[in-house]
Amino acid sequence: MTYRELGQTGVKVSALGLGGSHIGTPKLSSAEAVRIIRAALDAGLNFMDNSWDYHKGESEKRLGRALKNGYRSKAFVMTKVDGRNKKEAARQLDESLKRLGLDEIDLLQHHEVIRFDDVDRVFAAGGAMEAFLAARKAGKIRFIGFTGHKDPEVHLHMLRTAQAHGFRFDTVQMPLNLLDTHYRSFEKKVLPELTAAGIGVLGMKSMGAGVILNSKALTPTECLTYALSLPTSVVITGIDSMKILKQAFQIGGSFKPLTTREMASLRAKSAAIAANGEYELFKTTSAFDSTASHPEWLGEESSRTQRLTAE
């Protein structure tokens, strides 16, 4: 397994990460999920992705079971919370810690930052960032990041707002795939900002939860190899069987960065199906937006939004 620096944290992580949503899926038994996680850790894949809201907590519970009996020392554990105010974010974090059976998480991220208003809520007085900083001070978390999948401009707003508050994120998670380069591109707009700042880049949705593969235009190997060839710290991929785990290791184990010409060729190959975001449903629909169904996680709208919408 190839290992890469996680930004400026001083930590090295596996170039491939195990996606947390897939290990909590009902089609997979808890015992099989634990077997997959431990097989990945035994083979050197140490980056474990998760989130408070994945499958109503089942993903975190399964990861927690897998980390027992000495496996915690092999893992870099990341999870995410959706709360936008201090109280809700702190509540979700404590629940995640309990499910995982841990006193400390390596990386906690603001999940699903997909609206400009999300940024305002996170950094407002009494916002989620206060809970994150308090958790870090208390030794509950080591590093802080954020994720989002809708619009690169929201990511840029989050980065600039953090800078205005004198804060620097350790990591940023975003879609990086062969279609992204053509439509609302995180690769073009956000990736250069992160690499210049030395922030750890967490790539996700290299196959768009399988939707990109439904186009029949690209293969899993092309999708994953392209994402790995970008300046990422880790590419998180969904694995819900030992067969898929083996395939991921075959790609990762034999990985050699694509040449500039090879990457350009793949971009050209994907252009025809990428123009309108049809196969990047996470950008163009609410199908992947858990917070859209749970406004109570977000709390009140930001003061700016309230002011702008006031009659």
Question: Which ranges hold each PLM region?
Answer:
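Short histidine/acidic/glycine/proline-rich micro-motifs that form metal-
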Residues: H22-G24, W52-Y54, V81-R84, N177-T181, ...
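N-terminal binding-site loop/beta-alpha segment at the start of enzyme catalytic domains
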Residues: M1-A75, A131, K137, A310-E311
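A general structural detector for well-ordered alpha-helical segments in enzyme core domains, enriched
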Residues: T2, E32-I36, S59-A66, Q92-S96, ...
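Conserved, mostly hydrophobic/aromatic
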Residues: L6, L18, A40, M48, ...
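Active-site mouth loops of central-metabolism enzymes
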Residues: G19-A31, M78-E88, F116-R121, I212-L218
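Structured C-terminal cap/extension of enzyme domains
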Residues: L41, N46, H165-G166, K189-E311
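Glycine/proline-rich, positively charged
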Residues: K27, R84-K189, T195-L202
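Short catalytic-loop micro-motif centered on adjacent basic/acidic residues
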Residues: F47-D53, M78-K80, R142-T147, Q173-M174, ...
